[in-house]
Swiss-Prot record:
The keyword GTP-binding does not apply. It comes from the Archaea. It holds the Pfam family Ribosomal_L21e. Keywords: Ribonucleoprotein, Ribosomal protein. PROSITE patterns: RIBOSOMAL_L21E (PS01171). Belongs to the eukaryotic ribosomal protein eL21 family. It comes from Aeropyrum pernix (strain ATCC 700893 / DSM 11879 / JCM 9820 / NBRC 100138 / K1). Signal peptide: none annotated. One of its GO terms (biological process) is translation. PANTHER family: 60S RIBOSOMAL PROTEIN L21 (PTHR20981). This is Large ribosomal subunit protein eL21. One of its GO terms (molecular function) is structural constituent of ribosome. GO terms for cellular component: ribonucleoprotein complex; ribosome.
Length: 107
């Protein structure tokens, strides 16, 4: 038996699959241009249409984190993986807003 290769996207067949109605559709322009501020809570949801644009590893799909800063076009997002704190550089295409810092302050 030959050992199975362990590439970066292995075991992602179901994880990186779009629903049937979304296949072939282009995301809204606001998805690319969305601005986040430091302290905003975001969810890391991988968009499989953009594999070459800073796609995070599959272990981070579905995790929530806090925006810590911006680096180039990507955002620095701090997430916890178990007890360990990780800093990821994720473009806005793979992020979804949960709440903003202003909403939590009540203004």
């Amino acid at each position: 038996m030959v050992k199975a290769p362990r590439g970066y996207r292995n075991r992602t067949r179901r994880l990186l699959r779009k629903p049937v109605r979304e296949k072939g559709s282009i995301p809204r322009l606001s998805t690319y241009l969305r601005e986040y501020r430091v302290g905003d809570k975001v969810a890391i949801i991988i968009n499989p249409s953009f594999p070459d644009w800073g796609m995070p590893h599959r272990r981070f799909h579905g995790l929530t984190g806090t925006v810590v800063g911006k680096r180039g076009e990507a955002y620095e997002v701090e997430v916890y993986l178990g007890r360990k704190r990780k800093t990821l550089f994720v473009p806005p295409v793979h992020l979804k807003p949960l709440s903003t810092a202003a909403e939590r302050r009540g203004s």
